[in-house]
């Protein structure tokens, strides 16, 4: 059940009646008509912009449309009142039974309450993390991993068919650096002094890789020139790093469906095929780019190169795909990789990049648009940095990693659930502060604790009621006399339950899972507020000894909140608390 969607359907139906009666011209586009909570709750339960949206195409004053619409809606038994405000906004109040029906729907639908068919089975590929396989994941990867996984869960919950994908960057120079770094640890494992030259990876995490190389090869690689051991060690070390990355992701309960290799694109004709597709579209040419202003990018050279006419699809400048020496630029395999995803039949692509890849957005979007003839949209979500603190002081680096704080550091300090929730307490493109002490505080200022406390309180109510002999199954509670829920504070909490399906759809359309975390904090706040009022007003307590009808209704309300919190935390990948410790 989606009450906001149901009332919107009611509004659209009333507009259709107005068209039939000649009060509005036929064929008006109602796609932008919305029904949402008003900015000020004192104005009503819901508000619609129908009159404001349709006034111009209808050639009428918005207030005239609003008044005619209000008259039709007020006649519906679900609407208590319909009032025109300002130039033509329409505020609606629903009969209390509508909010009570939401509670019953949440109990009947359980974990599926709020689940939507909005996506209609659309196949979406969400590529995220895609960290270079050169070391353990750092805190920036942590935020990207949580964001991507929660976004995938949100899209799944809203009716999409989702693939979680990791692109292994194993085709560039960085994996050669990894191989040389691992080789030095191999020498160390054989009793020699490692030469960790500048530019190599210094972290202790490569020591086990060196030992594993010794176990496999003994001393046989020590006297060989680099060209004889480089490829073998590179593949061995890359596999070891990917095993480490999989373990790191598992600490956060992130599990990929697909791992795609950049290296696999070379020598298979896939890059050539993707570039040829662009060439046939008239988007590949030979030329010399003007030198860019400011910092010179790595792929610019003052010689003729093979260029992609990305400006034809919204980019600022055309982009090199092949250098003058005949080698591919970094961009070429990325084009081929996205062409591969398009060929696999996805209806939409989402890339989750670090904020330092902001310059890549326009060129990649242009490439996908060109490759798919505009059929497959690409949404690039940029993940801003995470600043780490402990009691307000900057958190120190990990010795194991060499230069950075690892995902493992974060999860070991804070736990997976706390880490996941807190990483979603800001929009992805805003910097996030993560204080190891504060995220574990038991206070309203800590959203993780506050939401989990609400979950635990609901569970406590159910346990105590069961101990009093009340049947607390969802099926039994759904039969309660919900007309007993009549206090404004109770109805306000029911309204929040009603907003859940709408929140899911809005968050899914925007690709913004942080909206789920924000909503959970809001509904937890409403529950805590009602709970605290019960300390002074016994009639508002969830447990009403001596009045089984009232108690069943109030427990049903609490349970409906629990259903929503559990579903929301599930999307975020967080386990709902049954009790606070």
From Swiss-Prot:
PROSITE patterns: AA_TRNA_LIGASE_I (PS00178). Belongs to the class-I aminoacyl-tRNA synthetase family. This is Arginine--tRNA ligase. A motif ('HIGH' region) lies at residues 131-141. It holds the Pfam family tRNA-synt_1d. The keyword Aminoacyl-tRNA synthetase applies. It is found in: Cytoplasm. It comes from Paracoccus denitrificans (strain Pd 1222). Its main location: cytoplasm. The keyword Protein biosynthesis applies. Keywords: Aminoacyl-tRNA synthetase, ATP-binding, Cytoplasm, Ligase, Nucleotide-binding, Protein biosynthesis. One of its GO terms (cellular component) is cytoplasm. Monomer. InterPro entries: aa-tRNA-synth_I_CS, Arg-tRNA-ligase, Arg-tRNA-synth_N, Arg-tRNA-synth_N_sf, ArgRS_core, DALR_anticod-bd, Rossmann-like_a/b/a_fold, tRNAsynth_Ia_anticodon-bd. GO terms for biological process: arginyl-tRNA aminoacylation. GO terms for molecular function: arginine-tRNA ligase activity; ATP binding. It comes from the Bacteria. SMART domains: Arg_tRNA_synt_N, DALR_1.
